[in-house]
């Protein structure tokens, strides 16, 4: 796992530049898709593409507890390697309103079972976690945050 203070886009290689370009193109598509929405999340969407990225590799029994990304506006995940779910949501990403200090068992949860190559965007303020998995394989992702100009690292 890349330490969070090391931004993979800070001194990019040619491959990282290609990856960043893919993300930026997907962000453009995302913005166009929702541009007519009246919610403040879209209306105040950052116009500058300040991306902060890192990698995560989880092994068997790997998971991430529910968390948010407080300095980001939008967070994203690119799935480089996924794990088979075995019908139990293993390796899925779960979105909810539940976090360390915000637990409500009745709050809605949304599970997404990723496939290799998927890119997933979500508000950085939305709690998310990785469902633990039992298969003897790795789950490898590139995570990133779109940082508003005032919050740039």
What is each of the regions a protein language model found here?
Residues 1-42, 63:
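Non-heme Fe(II)/2-oxoglutarate
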Residues 32-35, 83-88:
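Proline-centered turn/helix-capping motifs that create local helix->coil transitions or kinks
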Residues 42-48, 65-70:
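Short, conserved, surface-exposed binding loops centered on an aromatic residue
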Residues 47-57:
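A short glycine-rich, His/Asp/Glu-containing loop-to-beta-strand
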Residues 56-60, 68-86, 97-99, 145:
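Short, conserved beta-strand element in jelly-roll/cupin
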Residues 61-74, 88-90, 107-108, 114-116:
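A short beta-loop-beta micro-motif enriched in histidine and acidic residues
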Residues 90-91, 97-153:
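Catalytic core of Fe(II)/2-oxoglutarate
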């Amino acid at each position: 796992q890349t330490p969070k203070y090391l931004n993979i886009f800070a001194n990019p290689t040619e491959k990282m530049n290609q990856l960043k370009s893919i993300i930026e193109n997907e962000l453009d598509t995302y913005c166009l898709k929702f541009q007519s929405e009246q919610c403040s999340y879209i209306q105040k969407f950052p116009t500058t593409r300040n991306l902060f990225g890192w990698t995560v590799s989880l092994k068997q029994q790997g998971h991430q507890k529910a968390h948010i990304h407080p300095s980001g506006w939008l967070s994203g995940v690119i799935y480089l390697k996924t794990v088979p779910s075995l019908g139990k949501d293993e390796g899925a990403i779960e979105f909810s309103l539940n976090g360390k200090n915000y637990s409500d068992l009745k709050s809605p949860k949304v599970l997404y079972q990723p496939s290799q190559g998927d890119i997933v965007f979500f508000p950085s303020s939305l709690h998310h976690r990785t469902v633990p998995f039992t298969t003897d394989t790795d789950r490898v992702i590139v995570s990133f945050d779109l940082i508003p100009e005032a919050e740039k690292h």
